């Protein structure tokens, strides 16, 4: 659905050129919710604005639904953009227009007749749960309601793709959850492909099928969300994951425990999160596991749990128990003295 290939973008700055995007490529499948995460200055906002050519890349290919956007004439580009909705952190509502008019005015500009405009506005206000706010003004709405109006406006053009530029970053946690639930429902019920950018890992956790991690204008890590959570490879990715799942314990404690056994992080996903794998290990092997910390949550719609466990016993028995756990679809990682994770073979 969305194919970005070798995208490069450079801006002129007072201290010299700033390369915002460096040969970035990513692919978003039809019906997918794909997240791009990174800290400020990573290049993620520039990247998402290249998808509908609000930013023209210096080089590279931008395809949406197999159409190469970078070669389109202005008229054809406007038509193609009508199939790409976009929502922003700042809502971008007309302060002096009602909720109805904020959605209707852009529709009227496309040439829709009055009845079609009215029907479409009502349809999407119903979808976002604001049917009773038809005549309200933005100043009378909460932040979450303003974002719902912005979503309804984007959906009213009936796009195939929805771009979300930090759409929840200005909202409180409860409102963020409600907006994420709405995006999930839109994706499921309307079949709209969603590409979102964020600096919040909980957003990725709640809604994304796949995720790309950006740093200094580059995609440094990419994969299915569950795989990124289970086995982050690079420091930046680990920082994002640890912002939600931190099992750090003092290095000297790990050092002491490791003198008599081994400390390991166990990750459970989906059906394996409900299996008594650790209990089975104690019956099968001569080891004594001691749970140091743990947590359980969901990644999109599947359970995900982690335990930090000290395994006491002979190393051969511990190694066999690790293999048994991996055979039970439990991901096992050893923990070194400095708190960094290493994969256990």
From Swiss-Prot:
Query: Could you say which residues bind ATP here?
Result: 38-45
Q: Which UniProt keywords apply?
A: Amino-acid transport, ATP-binding, Cell membrane, Membrane, Nucleotide-binding, Translocase, Transport
Question: What molecular functions are annotated in GO for this chain?
Answer: ABC-type D-methionine transporter activity; ATP binding; ATP hydrolysis activity
Compartment(s): Cell membrane
Q: Which GO terms describe its cellular component?
A: plasma membrane
Q: Which reaction does it catalyse?
A: L-methionine(out) + ATP + H2O = L-methionine(in) + ADP + phosphate + H(+); D-methionine(out) + ATP + H2O = D-methionine(in) + ADP + phosphate + H(+)
In this chain the ABC transporter domain maps to 2-241
InterPro entries referenced in this protein's UniProt entry, alphabetically = AAA+_ATPase, ABC_transporter-like_ATP-bd, ABC_transporter-like_CS, ACT-like_dom_sf, MetN_ABC, MetN_ABC_transporter-like, NIL_domain, P-loop_NTPase
Kind of enzyme, top EC level? translocase
Assigned EC number: 7.4.2.11
Membrane topology of the entry? Peripheral membrane protein
SUBUNIT field: The complex is composed of two ATP-binding proteins (MetN), two transmembrane proteins (MetI) and a solute-binding protein (MetQ).
Instruction: Give the family, as the similarity comment puts it.
Output: Belongs to the ABC transporter superfamily. Methionine importer (TC 3.A.1.24) family.
What does the UniProt function comment say about this protein?
Part of the ABC transporter complex MetNIQ involved in methionine import. Responsible for energy coupling to the transport system.
Identify this protein by name.
Methionine import ATP-binding protein MetN 4
Origin species: Oceanobacillus iheyensis (strain DSM 14371 / CIP 107618 / JCM 11309 / KCTC 3954 / HTE831)
Starting at the broadest rank, the lineage of the source organism is: Bacteria, Bacillati, Bacillota, Bacilli, Bacillales
Gene of this entry: metN4
